[in-house]
Each structure stands twice: as structure tokens, then as C-alpha cells.
């Protein structure tokens, strides 16, 4: 229900519009975009109009006076106010905390989906996510780095696990890199199983991005896959490819030092998989070792997994 206050009198606006013209004779609207369930109010002098954002996060307020209105959205402890000059126009009232870690994942998802990321959210910022009863630190590793697979533009943020997932996995049980990233067990079996354990809101919001990887078996041919959860390639972690072919992307801004490439499992430094097939053999994939250096190993070896994703 919306409440309209005109000249100090409150009028309910329910299932149909009630128009109360003032001396200016105008009827105007503000369409406020915010979070679902947020309380939205517009105030000008002694006149206030209020409403609640629908499930899509839109609250349309009907006003009866032009001019400058103060529009406020409130949801829990979050409040944001913007001043708008009313004819009919939209106002963005996306609610978020300036400190990335202080936002819940639903808010982070909503901000990413809006396409407008606050400047205070920086590469290297992190937030905890609970997956299958275990808490993991999730880092921002890039901004506007990955392309959406549907061609609709760039993902505002790319996220990756700060350390390794609690279970070690083989890259390919057949001990081959033939078929590359596209056909390996990690991509077709293990990562989908992990994704099914992530928070429901996160699962629903993760979008496919385009990842480039060689097809394996010593071939320099690069193919593009559409991935929700993915592993990083060698060039996305290091300054240049040493054991993989050119063309598998570019380095994420996060990976500026060997220390940042070192990941842990239960407090111990752990080697972790890359998606890059080793260019000189038909039976190895690339890895990052426990000291943060590049390397390669048989794909039926169980190593750490630090997957990435975008909203």
C-alpha cells in the first residue's frame, strides 16, 4: 500500500490510482530502482509520498506537484537519499555499503547486475562465502575483465577463492590433456558438483563468461568455452605463458606477486590447478606450486581447486 500525504492529510492509495490535483494541475511519477522490499519515500515541503519496492526492486511513486523532491530508500540498516527534479524520471537508489566486505551476497549480486560498481570496491577486497558448511574467503581479482558469453558486455567483477576448496581433485582421470579444458573432468564433473553446493542466490546469479584455452595434445589451437565456474589459465595468473600456448587471456590485476599466487589448504601451502594444458606433452596440465611458481603435472594427480566466477 502507498500512503499519500497532501496538505497534512493522509490518503491511502491501494488497488487503483487516486488522483488529487493541486493548483498546478499536474500528475507526475518517480520510478525508483532499489532493492526488493525497500521502503521508498519522496518528500517536498510538507508533502510525502511513500511506497514499497516490488520483487524487481522498482517502486513507482505518483506525485501531484512538480519541482525538487527528496527521494529516500530504506532497507534494514541501509539508507540512501537522492534529490530529483520531478517531471517523470527514473532515479537509481541501489543500496550498498561502501566497504565491500560489509555487504551480503544478495547486495553484491544486485550491484553487479546493475552494471554500476562503486569505486570503493577494489581488486583485492574479499568477502566470506559459506559453501557446504565451510567458510571461504572470496576475492575480487578483476574489474571489467571477463566478457559475458552471450555477448551482452563485460562482467563488472570477477571473483576467485582466496585459498583452495576443502577437497582435492584430479583434472582428468584418464591422465591426458587431449580435449583440453573443454572436455576435462574438472570442467564437466567436479566444478558443477561444487556449484550445486553454493548458496542458492549465488548459484542463480552466476553468469557464463567466455574463456579461451588451447585444445590440448600439444595443439596451439585456441577454443572458447562458456563457463560459470572456471579455473584460471597460466597467463591469467603470471606475466606471460611459460608452459602453455599464447591466447588464453590476460593477467588479472590481482596477481601482482608470488605471495598472492600462493594458496593454502588447512593452513598448509597447496599446489593448485590451472585450466591450461601443458604445451609440450599430451598428458599434463599446468599448475601453480606451493611456493607460487608455475609448473605442470599429470592430470590424474589430486591438487587444490581455486575456482573463479562472475555475476
What is each residue range found by the language model?
Residues 32, 57, 71-73, 140:
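Extracellular/surface recognition and adhesion modules
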Residues 92-311:
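Collagenous Gly-X-Y triple-helix signature in extracellular proteins
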Residues 44-63:
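Short, acidic Ser/Thr/Gly-rich low-complexity loop/linker segments typical of extracellular
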Residues 24-43:
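Structural motif
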Residues 2, 36-40, 67-69:
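Short beta-strand/loop motifs in extracellular/secreted proteins, especially
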Residues 59-70, 76:
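Short Pro-Gly-centered beta-turn/loop motif in secreted/extracellular proteins
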Residues 1-27:
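N-terminal low-complexity, intrinsically disordered "leader/linker" segments enriched in small/polar
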Residues 74-93:
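Structured interaction patches on ligand/partner-binding surfaces of diverse proteins
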